[in-house]
Amino acid sequence: MRFSSNNRKVLETFYKNFYYLVSLLLFSILILRLFQLQIIHGKRYFVQSEKNRIRAITLKPLRGRIFDRNGEMLVGNQPAYSVYATPYELQSWQGIYTHLANILKIPEDELKTIVKKHQQGKFNPVKLKRQVNFETLSRINEERLDLPGVGFWIESKRFYPSSARVAHVLGYLGEVSPDELEKFKGEGYRYGDVIGKQGVERQYEKLLRGQFGYEFVEVDALGREVRKVEEQKPIAPKPGMDLYLTIDVDIQTLAESLLGSRKGSLVLLNVRNGEVLCLVSKPDFDPSVFAGIITEKQWDYFQNHPNHPLYNRAIQSTYPPGSTYKLVLAIAALESGIITPEWSISCSGRFRFGARNFKCWKSRGHGVVNLYQAIEQSCNVYFYQLSLKTGLSRWADFGRKLGFGRKTGIDIGMESEGVVPDEAYLDSHYGKGQWTEGMLLNLAVGQGDLLVTPLQMAQLAMILANYGKYFRPHVVKRIYEPVTRKEIPIKVDSSQVQGVSHRVYEIVRQGMWLVVNGASGTGRAAALQDIAVAGKTGTAQNPHGDDHAWFIGFAPFDFPRVAIVVMVENGGSGGAVAAPIARQILQEYFRKYPVKLPEKMAISLPVE
């Protein structure tokens, strides 16, 4: 079929018009899209493009320092160097991993794993090793032409100038773990950073750590740094806050030396505000070990040593309190009206209950004793019989009222609650109807399933000193903000034990005075020449070895300032071992912080 010239022209005109129409349509779509991108969404896309072009480089702050109550530095900072590498450069140079692994003394496979696991883009540097020595830095500097993308940052590490370790109060730092990286996601932690693992370093991590700063660099399409962005001012890092502890470093040093190589703990509290003046747990550890790179051998020692040096025995370990807990039973019986302080029994050295003889620590017996004398001489038979009159339920209720079976709330965390057994507890552990009242006799003298922490016993001494008032134990006295130079005081929480009268406290306190100052007192080794001390000894039986030695007390008797607990694992007699240690600590405290009091104030006691 042939087209005429007119038909051909019509067809050409049609195609031309169609082409123009399609072109116009496509151009219109393009214009609309440009309008949408630049006018409607322009601001959003501009911000996104700037984010892609501008990168923020993190500037780490100096960690806050830690001082004792009088301003002596316990923890400071000193320079340390960390080696980093840019993943893109490592992948581009053959043999660089082998060379770098040799310099850093890290297996090559491990080095590759670090880079692969922690890189965030090809051009973001990854920390390979922290706290490298000067020999390593020198090699990297000398061989920098063969190590493209490898460099070092100046950071800081902890140092400990004090003679006192204060280990379990200060705690220690360690590299942030994968779990912690996930937990604190978005808070700026990266692989190789350090974080508080224990003590105030852990509890006050956010304050000590400070706030990151940032400087801004321009990067190209591949993410490589081109230049620093001068138009955008860098944000300076904000140093961490300094902590001033309640600890007195002189008393702490003495306490550490008195416990020496023995296992145990010692706590001294200010009864007027709950300040912890010293807290020792033995064995302890040298915190400076954790300031460096801890070796596998060192970590294995800390984790698997049978004496568990990282464990804070003052707040984490629980023990039977022995005769120190007789004070709780006395309070329960007196407040419930079950006895008066004149109620007496005759101690022959043992008490027959059912088919079993329950012994007193004094085999030939104490003779006739009332409550005052029973506390003074720590007569087991008296408290065996008193427990049967009082009952398990009352005994447990008053134990909980006085702070046992729950945490004290001390600000170093990782605290144990202890155990105050009641009927429900015994039913669940031994079966309903499978336990007998004989268990109550063991509980009466601080044995059996009853478990307490040394800090809980120090808190009991504070409660008795203050006639029921007590403060939350705490180790941080104030916080100092180095930028504004402002001090932030710590709020002190106080409480009053409910349901125990002033009269009952007075009776029990008088018994405690006799323990230290009476002719037959078991705690006479804690007595001071010019200051009246009140206390209670304990010798807790231990199924796994020798007895534990306990002493709790407070002083001065009439105007209490401090409460103390000394617990020596497998130490033997509380009166012979723990009480003399308490005396030396109290002596040092009153030497350093003297009080004007009348010489030992006599107390008129209704003792038969």
Feature roles, as predicted:
Residues 2-6, 10-13, 75, 220-234, ...:
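Beta-lactam-recognizing serine transpeptidase/beta-lactamase-like catalytic domain environment
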